[in-house]
Amino acid sequence: IVPFLLGMVPKLVCLITKKC
């Protein structure tokens, strides 16, 4: 898996769940 994608996943989860 590309490191860039690994970095994007937590950000997407943060935006969706509003838990940062």
Swiss-Prot record:
Transmembrane segments: none annotated. The keyword S-adenosyl-L-methionine does not apply. One of its GO terms (cellular component) is extracellular region. It comes from the Eukaryota. Its main location: secreted. The keyword Signal does not apply. InterPro entries: Antimicrobial_frog_1. Keywords: Amphibian defense peptide, Antibiotic, Antimicrobial, Cytolysis, Disulfide bond, Fungicide, Hemolysis, Oxidation, Secreted. Expressed by the skin glands. It is found in: Secreted. The modification Methionine sulfoxide is found at residue 8. GO terms for biological process: defense response to bacterium; defense response to fungus; killing of cells of another organism. Disulfide bonds join 14-20. Antimicrobial peptide active against Gram-positive bacterium S.epidermidis ATCC 12228 (MIC=4 uM), against Gram-negative bacterium E.coli ATCC 25922 (MIC=64 uM) and against yeast C.parapsilosis ATCC 22019 (MIC=16 uM). Has hemolytic and cytotoxic activity. Belongs to the frog skin active peptide (FSAP) family. Brevinin subfamily. This is Brevinin-1ITa. It comes from Rana italica (Italian stream frog).
